Amino acid sequence: MRIGVVGDPDVVVGFRLAGLTDVYEVKSPEQAAKAIEELNSNSEIGLIITTERIGEEIRDTISGVKKVVVEVPDKNGPIVRENDPVKVLVRNAVGVDIK
């Protein structure tokens, strides 16, 4: 199983330095969607990493992907969401609101 990465130049450089080869540097949502589709059609790819911002821009494309997709923060940090599902799960399980 190989890992594919789709991201902006600042994100992909770290993954290239880590030795990943299936890395797509994109500058538009259209390029990102095309790269995600290419990785999804590659049978050797088992995990696709992209940024949260790209994930928000191409949510429909990502929803159709059959592989595991992980969205990581970019250089601007994580996207703050009103109803973060992870926060809700932690609050319900532990009884503590994380900030």
Curated annotation (Swiss-Prot):
The keyword Membrane applies. It comes from the Archaea. Keywords: ATP synthesis, Cell membrane, Hydrogen ion transport, Ion transport, Membrane, Transport. Belongs to the V-ATPase F subunit family. It is a peripheral membrane protein. Component of the A-type ATP synthase that produces ATP from ADP in the presence of a proton gradient across the membrane. Has multiple subunits with at least A(3), B(3), C, D, E, F, H, I and proteolipid K(x). The gene is atpF. This is A-type ATP synthase subunit F. It is found in: Cell membrane. It holds the Pfam family ATP-synt_F. One of its GO terms (molecular function) is proton-transporting ATP synthase activity, rotational mechanism. HAMAP family: ATP_synth_F_arch (MF_00312). GO terms for cellular component: plasma membrane. InterPro entries: ATPase_V1-cplx_f_g_su, ATPase_V1-cplx_fsu_bac/arc, ATPase_V1_fsu_sf. The keyword Manganese does not apply. Its main location: membrane. GO terms for biological process: proton motive force-driven plasma membrane ATP synthesis.
